[in-house]
């Protein structure tokens, strides 16, 4: 499956898209798998399982800021996990919430419309709801 363009310079994909990054011209990769693949371009690795008990929330503020700063600097960013369905979708939804001031539901629908196969696990949905509360209470939007 090809990586999916979500907004200008932000793509959601799977591990194969990371491996073949040169085919797509990515400048930065956010890797959300258990494997610390070095792609030869700037890569951020968050070692996390696709499990309802995995803590992705503690990374959301930092990784959404990183995505925002990268895009602002004109970089083409790929966010990927193994299949491009749960972990990477969660991070991209969080970024859309923060950058567009969307609710969790609106951000989920926005990303789902672009990449119909997304399906964050129930634990990640709860963490996105927590992230939404943090955004609303701190006004920490871009």
From Swiss-Prot:
A single GO molecular function term of this UniProt record: protein tyrosine/threonine phosphatase activity
Location of the active site: 81 (phosphocysteine intermediate)
Coiled-coil region(s): none
Biological process, per Gene Ontology: negative regulation of MAPK cascade
Record keyword Acetylation present: no
Domain Tyrosine-protein phosphatase: 2-137
Keywords attached to this entry: Hydrolase, Protein phosphatase
Keyword Protease: no
EC nos: 3.1.3.-
CDD domains xrefs: DSP
Pfam families according to UniProt: DSPc
Family: Belongs to the protein-tyrosine phosphatase family.
Official protein name in the record: Putative tyrosine phosphatase 123R
Organism: Invertebrate iridescent virus 6
